[in-house]
Amino acid sequence: MRFSLTFLVRLTSAAALIFIIGVSGCTGKVVAARSLPGDDISPKAPAIVFGFLGGFVAHDDPVHAEVQLAAQLRKEFPTGVEVETFENTHVARARQQILKFLDTDRDGMLSKEEKQGARIIIYGHSWGGWATVALARALEKDGIPVLLTIQVDSVSKRGRNDTLIPANVAQAVNYYQPFGIVHGDHDIKAADATRTRILGNYRFDYKKSPLNCADYPWYDRFFVKPHTQIECDPEIWAKAESLIRANLPQIPAKGSK
């Protein structure tokens, strides 16, 4: 008896289907199609720490404390944490970077889970403090939460408000000094006090305990002396670093597994 090739193929496929159904019935389990490697893997997005520089300072100027803090964090968190610094004019660029980091499945859009899994910390000095709040507001429109914002002698830009912290921010802190032609805002407030905790508005006075800030440009030390002193104050950045670390993954102790 002769069988066509098409008939044999159909017969083989039917036999395979009967076998699969039989195995499923015996085990009580439905046999699912096998996934390709990585199909159900959803990697966790990194924690994100972004800093903004004040004035017209370059994003990688090593003299400035914001850049130094970022370098220290990169050294101690080589994986699992994305640390970057930006000029205060690059809020939109920083937002795009965040969207890229959160898109863990690389499908070009953020799911609710990807948004809610965000762990974002933003800090900045002077106009960088304004940029900190501006980025947090942009992320609020995207439905993305922010763990912490840190403003150091924050100065509003072009009359834009940098004192009202958006409701997507969990915690916010403000360090300021009130002297000189350029000085920070003395009081930040939560747009929604039930969702945002203001850790404090902390005032600093460098008249009694002046700082040299020898590495900073002479014009900063001359024209905006107090504003520069708060930026180069190691106490400020030690406090900021402590708050940031509290919201980052714990570094395993040496020798631990």
Regions found by a protein language model. Give the residues of each.
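Solvent-exposed, acidic/flexible segments
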Residues: 58-66, 87, 91, 124-132, ...
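Bacterial N-terminal signal peptides that target proteins for export
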Residues: 2-15
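Active-site catalytic motif of lipid deacylating hydrolases and related acyltransferases
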Residues: 38-118, 222
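C-terminal motif of bacterial Sec signal peptides marking the signal peptidase cleavage site
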Residues: 22-25
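Serine-dependent carboxylesterase/thioesterase catalytic core
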Residues: 69, 73, 80, 98-192
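Bacterial signal peptide processing site
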Residues: 27-30
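C-terminal catalytic-base region of ester-bond hydrolases, centering on the histidine
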Residues: 167-257
